[in-house]
Amino acid sequence: MAHIYRLLLLLLSNLWFSTAAQNQSETEWPLHDNGLSKVVQWDHYSFQVNGQRIFIFSGEFHYWRIPVPELWRDILEKVKATGFTAFAFYSSWAYHAPNNSTVDFSTGARDITPIFELAKELGMYMIVRPGPYVNAEASAGGFPLWLMTGEYGSLRNDDPRYTAAWTPYFANMSQITSKYQVTDGHNTLVYQIENEYGQQWIGDPKNRNPNKTAVAYMELLEASARENGITVPLTSNDPNMNSKSWGSDWSNAGGNVDVAGLDSYPSCWTCDVSQCTSTNGEYVPYKVIDYYDYFQEVQPTLPSFMPEFQGGSYNPWAGPEGGCPQDTSAEFANLFYRWNIGQRVTAMSLYMLYGGTNWGAIAAPVTATSYDYSAPISEDRSIGAKYSETKLLALFTRTAKDLTMTEAIGNGTQYTTNTAVRAFELRNPQTNAGFYVTFHTDTTVGGNQAFKLHVNTSVGALTVPKNEGLIQLNGHQSKIIVTDFTLGKRTLLYSTAEVLTYAVFENRPTLVLWVPTGESGEFAIKGAKSGKVENGDGCSGIKFKREKDYLVVNFSQAKGLSVLRLDNGVRVVLLDKAAAYRFWAPALTDDPNVQETETVLVHGPYLVRSASISKTTLALRGDSVEKTTLEIFAPHSVRKITWNGKEVQTSHTPYGSLKATLAAPPDIKLPALTSWRSNDSLPERLPSYDDSGPAWIEANHMTTSNPSPPATFPVLYADEYGFHNGVRLWRGYFNGSASGVFLNIQGGSAFGWSAWLNGHFLDSHLGTATTSQANKTLTFPSSILNPTENVLLIVHDDTGHDQTTGALNPRGILEARLLSNDTSSPPPEFTHWRLAGTAGGESNLDPIRGVFNEDGLFAERMGWHLPGFDDSAWTSENSATSASSALSFTGATVRFFRSVVPLNIPAGLDVSISFVLSTPTAAPKGYRAQLFVNGYQYGRYNPHIGNQVVFPVPPGILDYQGDNTIGLAVWAQTEEGAGIQVDWKVNYVADSSLSVAGFGKGLRPGWTEERLKFA
């Protein structure tokens, strides 16, 4: 049958590149299911749930990058408020498996059942992506770091050692998910196997020569998922258009999933766009990619599905401060997401919708602490223009039911009266509804182009606007012009203004249209004969012209909201873009496929989280950040409005809406960061230091399973000894004289190291944004050498394990070779090495925060960063009584600073707080600093490398109604020492249903005496 579908595809392609015809015969595409259930089905057009088609507009968030479960509601309510029908998340094997005998889905933020329950409550489908490999700019791509020794093979294959390693985690994840599937009335829609594993073929995929190892691996994963209760469709995501893996339309070679998908980052997944040239070619802003031909060639009988489409980009070390939001701005969201619709995509998930924070040692070396990703929801949880721009399209796709079943009829400049503008015509073969997606012919050009559009409608061919004005594309912009758009029992014949949404109250539709501020629009409603202006806020030039079967309305909309009423019962709300940004359509149902009778319309607030109606009362939950006028379009039965549980005084407008005023939230002032104390955190540099305690391990392996053996022995790879994160300390002993040492150390991009001999500082590798391995020859001054035993201390950090095939790249000392000026005899050798890292190693001493939270610094091993530690004997820093602290010291060492600061944030507010770290102008920059908040490492600040200075810390990590322990570990890599300025600030205050005061109880365990043994 495949050749028949490809023949049909060829015929469709001819239509696609030809001038549009009004009608197209409907092609009979096969309807697929996975043989286990018919609840979820799919075909050439879209996914279906219980026989209903749905446009899947989804966005990614990572629960492990915001380890406060109460805040998952905040993120997911903001996702729902955009109009998204789904969300996606990677699970992290590493986050749940601190060692090879533990899988933890119950402790603290590792219990993910609230996510599944929220999906059901809020009414969104889930795309669950368990890995076992996820990439995600996570250390080792989400693999647990105990897997990095080489003893489990080369990974991501059918090696029995690797299979035995991933099976417990993957089985647990599948079993948890199995309780929350669409097939059982819950909300998991699909289950992704592996991640960007485009390895099905050896050589050119067109030759279809299967990679049997990769096929066997995928079949093992699929079997495990099914054996552990997964009945929803299994999916995959190709990393690019070249690999063509795991789709049954392409081949039946083995290992195929039910629905294959394609990932795409047309503007580059990182702020360093040079990293994407091998995939995307030369970077040209706003250059688009053709996906239609790919999907028609590779999976013509499946939906055009993009499990990852660019929602932003991560900021690498030394990237611009604050990332590169200009690369994936609101304009990007406007153009590229509409482009996908023009390409007939009906299922796409934005990566990321909320990025979060690489707290602790979660990150791969490619990025620093922030994982803001320039996503629509910022790292500090605020929403802005990009979020609002995304919402304009998501609400449209939720309400445009005919968009879930379209054929591509044609594209080109022949649709317009301006050759600088082209259009793509999509048409529903059953209803004849049309969607004309318009762009600049050259999308990289952002000028202002005006045009008319040739469309086919149920009343014949028209050129619109008919009466006056032109359609405008101003800047990097796209517009979707609809024809024969269903409004309940009415029909929008066409509109040059974009549809935001519509609702039906008492069998009468309320249509919401928007245009950029100051632009004009024209629309036509079938069956209407006359109309009137009921509210003309900002609207001018309104004209009604009756045609034979429809009424044409022209308008120009400045700032504001206007309301028109037509004689056939249609109410039309006209918005400019600014007003549309503050317009919401909260659902009254927990069904993700929201119908037009199951929503209300709200204008004004910063955020509307939810709505429900009980008798005559409409209960709204949301956020207000300023004094706001609330306007509501709802059923006539609604007489009272509550906002966050409190009734608000309302008034009725002549055109049927309700209005109320929301007060501004109070200002929040943070207390001063003063009363700092400090202590030395590098006693290990001293010869008198005793390293015989349980914090230290003898590093004595003479063989390794790692595929990259060291140049000298013993093996000094930290992972071999169970220490996987950040800073590690090596003490190498030797007897007699040596003139120096050659050291070659590997720790990932932006890593650094320092060395001391017998307590005397030698030198450091400060690190660069791109250097992952650094060697130096250090000279030993004869004055500090002992004739007998000498101790060389090496302190090095790493910035995480590399991703994909680089995951096994070792972290530690690749070569340590003593040197001698005496050429008559061999140079001395190290007698033995001792190693210290995270307190307890893989034993997971702090299961709430987890093994990624701590490094091996003395301060961390001793628990100085934890609440409740007694620092009364420490040195007082006597900071100035202001909202900042300047902390400094001289000498190459590590010093730990600590302060306890109370907060008393009132209930009923959502407050976001960030720390700001900076280096005073005259202070040295050759240092590394780590920020700790109530025991959590929430910032890595390297002023000589990276540009991140703002570190958001969420409520729940911060105690908003109690004392907060703030710590700074500062590692000076030169004798000049270090100077650091510490501030904090309020990002926003919202009167909110999300009352964050009191969040995080149980997430901030305190200091215990057990820490003392790790000195």
Curated annotation (Swiss-Prot):
Keywords carried by this UniProt record: Carbohydrate metabolism, Disulfide bond, Glycoprotein, Glycosidase, Hydrolase, Polysaccharide degradation, Secreted, Signal
Example GO biological process: polysaccharide catabolic process
Primary localisation category: secreted
Glycosylation: residue positions: 23, 99-100, 172, 211, 411, 456, 554, 679, 735, 775, 821
Chemical reaction(s) catalysed: Hydrolysis of terminal non-reducing beta-D-galactose residues in beta-D-galactosides
GO molecular function, one term: beta-galactosidase activity
Gene3D superfamilies: Beta-galactosidase, domain 2, Beta-galactosidase, domain 3, Galactose-binding domain-like, Glycosidases
Catalytic residues, chain numbering: 196 (proton donor), 308 (nucleophile)
UniProt signal peptide: 1-20
Disulfide bridge positions per record: 271-324
EC number(s) on file: 3.2.1.23
One term under GO cellular component: vacuole
Binding site for substrate: 90, 135-137, 195, 265, 373
Keyword Disulfide bond: yes
Pfam families cross-referenced by the UniProt entry: BetaGal_ABD2, BetaGal_dom2, BetaGal_dom3, Glyco_hydro_35
InterPro entries on file: Betagal_dom2 (IPR018954), Betagal_dom2_sf (IPR037110), BetaGal_dom3 (IPR025972), BetaGal_dom3_sf (IPR036833), BetaGal_jelly_roll_dom (IPR025300), Galactose-bd-like_sf (IPR008979), Gly_Hdrlase_35_cat (IPR031330), Glycoside_Hdrlase_35 (IPR001944)
Coiled-coil residue windows: none
Subcellular location: Secreted
Role noted for this protein: Cleaves beta-linked terminal galactosyl residues from gangliosides, glycoproteins, and glycosaminoglycans.
Family: Belongs to the glycosyl hydrolase 35 family.
Protein name listed in UniProt: Probable beta-galactosidase B
Source organism of the structure: Aspergillus fumigatus (strain ATCC MYA-4609 / CBS 101355 / FGSC A1100 / Af293)
Protein encoded by which gene: lacB
